[in-house]
C-alpha cells in the first residue's frame, strides 16, 4: 500500500485563523488494485486512490470514516471482472480500520 497524501484539515484551518477539531484525510492505495478497477470502468478513478478520514467528535471520541467499496462498485457500475478486487479491497480496508481503531 502506498500513502499518496495526508491532508491535515485542522492545520489548514489554523493557517487561516479558524479552528477545527483534529481532522486528517489520508489518500492511499495500491496502483495495481486501482488500475484493475479503472480497466473495468475508468470513472472509478474519481474515487481512487482510497481515502479515509480520521476525526475527533465533540465528545473527544475519534472516528475513522471511509467509503464503502460496494458503494464504489455500484457508483461506477463495475462488472464481474472487478468483483475479486473489490472483495480484496474490502478485506484490506476492514483490516486497516481494525488496526487504526483497535477494534
Language-model regions: role of each:
Residues 1-103:
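Feature detects long, helix-prone N-terminal segments enriched in hydrophobes
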Amino acid at each position: 500500500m502506498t500513502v499518496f497524501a495526508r491532508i491535515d484539515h485542522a492545520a489548514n484551518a489554523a493557517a487561516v485563523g479558524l479552528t477545527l477539531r483534529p481532522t486528517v484525510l489520508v489518500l492511499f492505495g495500491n496502483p495495481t488494485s486501482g488500475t484493475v478497477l479503472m480497466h473495468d470502468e475508468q470513472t472509478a478513478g474519481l474515487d481512487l486512490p482510497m481515502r479515509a478520514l480520521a476525526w475527533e467528535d465533540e465528545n473527544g471520541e475519534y472516528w475513522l470514516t471511509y467509503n464503502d467499496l460496494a458503494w464504489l462498485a455500484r457508483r461506477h457500475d463495475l462488472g464481474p471482472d472487478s468483483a475479486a478486487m473489490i472483495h480484496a479491497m474490502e478485506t484490506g480496508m476492514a483490516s486497516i480500520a481494525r488496526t487504526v481503531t483497535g477494534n
